[in-house]
Amino acid sequence: GSYFSSQSSTLPAAQKTGRLTIVPDSVVHSLVYDDAKNRVTGVRVIDANTKEQREYRARIVFLNASTLGSTRILLNSKSARFPNGLANSSGVLGQNLMDHHFMAGARGEIPGLKEHYYQGNRPNGIYIPRFRNLDEKTKRSDYIRGFGYQGGASRSGWGRGGSAPGFGVQLKRRLREPGDWSMGLTAFAECLPRAENAVTLSDETDEYGIPKLRINCAWGPNELAMRKDMADSAAEMLEAAGVKNVATYDLLKPDGLGAEPGLGIHEMGTARMGRDPKTSVLNAHNQAHDVPNLFVTDGSAMTSASCVNPSITYMALTARACDYAVKQMKEGAI
């Protein structure tokens, strides 16, 4: 389709190789580690239906269970050498959790277009790249890094009847026609990595006996400082474009809820890449510093969040890591 999905793109390509085996209803418990060889030797799974435990062996393991899933698996893969989680000699596994913060921006009405409507598939939205803290001219004194905008225009539907004046037959007749056009801009902003934003294993376990994750994460001073600018700049742009009755919004409440971490669904950073094994889990090729035949190429590898959707970056990192792993295998290094 026009919108990417693994089901329509990468999985069919993998199936055509004849070397893909999909094992459904398999819950990963941990990775199997050989202390004597310092290698992962496979994956330990639990059958979701029978609760039977099985192991799948492999020369090399790519762990890509999403940021929180991969981190949970690594933390639960304990051994004599790694009592605090596999490949965690640095102690930073689980730290520096990030997500994009958003739900702040502006929206207003577009006059004079009541006779215009779109046909066929929905039109695409717009994107405004980051424009803060790029150089001295755009530098802010109250925060570093910045945000971009995702936006679009639409006509209100019958749902506007919940707040529109009127009742009865007249209201119903009005709601049969498309409403006014409006346009909105929503900021997607960068979150800085901070060690205190972290996940650890809980004492509680799930139905498969696997420890749950305990998540401690909140926006820091830098994220909070940019949110007013996220809303005000959106309003300024819309008004300059001729949009009327512009109103700003920020759904983050004083108690920290409403726009809290996790709602962006772009979790990343908990098994970060880095040059120094003392401060990172993975090297520049997404290879674990501590365990050479283990690679992690999902969002947990990210060292910073930027302010853009990250999936294509994960795919690029995965392609590069696969190329490196193949070369390492051919050389007999892993």
Show where each model-derived region lies.
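Generic recognition of flexible, low-complexity loop/linker segments
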Residues: 9-12, 27-30, 50-52, 93-94, ...
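Short loop/turn segments at connectors of secondary-structure elements within structured domains
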Residues: 39, 69-70, 195, 209
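Glycine-rich loop(s) and the adjacent beta-strand/alpha-helix scaffold that form part
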Residues: 17, 26, 30-36, 43-118, ...
